[in-house]
């Protein structure tokens, strides 16, 4: 058993910033390797939208949340790459990183968590495609078949900690249809 700790930062925040965000403080506070209780711990940080790229990329990320799906996939990929049955998953997020964190947990609840073998066989794009299906009945049917063939049986998330969550992407009053697939409901698992 090991602990997988995923830390999703807010808009424009990155581990290399001069000022250290609270999410980065959480990431740095976790002892990687063998923890004090003898359990192996791994930490993965997902930088905030708008934290990298050219100025226009940073502005679009900050203003409209561009890059969020890339961050969700990066966090999900990290979990799939490192998860083994009985591992504990802890996910933290701040601001748009809270949205990212909830979406990652929603993706795990919706499509399941890929096994390492299925990840190696490039099924991550399939998982993302199914997660993006807007019709709930169609998504549920596709996800059930996908989970049975490519995912771990049951992957509970031990802890989801989010603070100052941003409730939406884009600009109020304009269409947000592209981002409506994100599952932000809290699962009983």
Spans of model-derived segments:
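Alpha-helical segment proximal to the catalytic Tyr-Lys
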Residues: 1-189
């Amino acid at each position: 058993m090991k602990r997988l700790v995923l830390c999703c930062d807010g808009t424009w925040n990155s581990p290399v910033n001069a000022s250290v965000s609270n999410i980065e403080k959480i990431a740095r506070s976790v002892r990687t390797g063998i923890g004090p209780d003898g359990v192996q711990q791994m930490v993965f940080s997902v930088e905030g939208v708008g934290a990298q790229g050219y100025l226009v990329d940073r502005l679009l990320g900050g203003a409209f949340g561009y890059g969020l799906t890339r961050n969700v996939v990066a966090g999900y990929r990290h979990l799939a790459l490192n998860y083994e049955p009985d591992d504990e998953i802890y996910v933290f997020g701040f601001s748009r990183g809270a949205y990212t964190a909830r979406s990652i947990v929603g993706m795990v609840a919706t499509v399941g968590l890929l096994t390492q073998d299925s990840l190696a066989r490039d099924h991550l794009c399939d998982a993302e495609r199914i997660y993006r299906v807007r019709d709930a009945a169609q998504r549920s049917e596709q996800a059930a078949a996908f989970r049975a063939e490519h995912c771990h049986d049951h992957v509970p998330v031990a802890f989801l900690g989010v603070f100052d969550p941003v409730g939406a992407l884009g600009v109020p009053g304009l269409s947000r249809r592209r981002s409506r697939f994100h599952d932000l409901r809290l699962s009983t698992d």
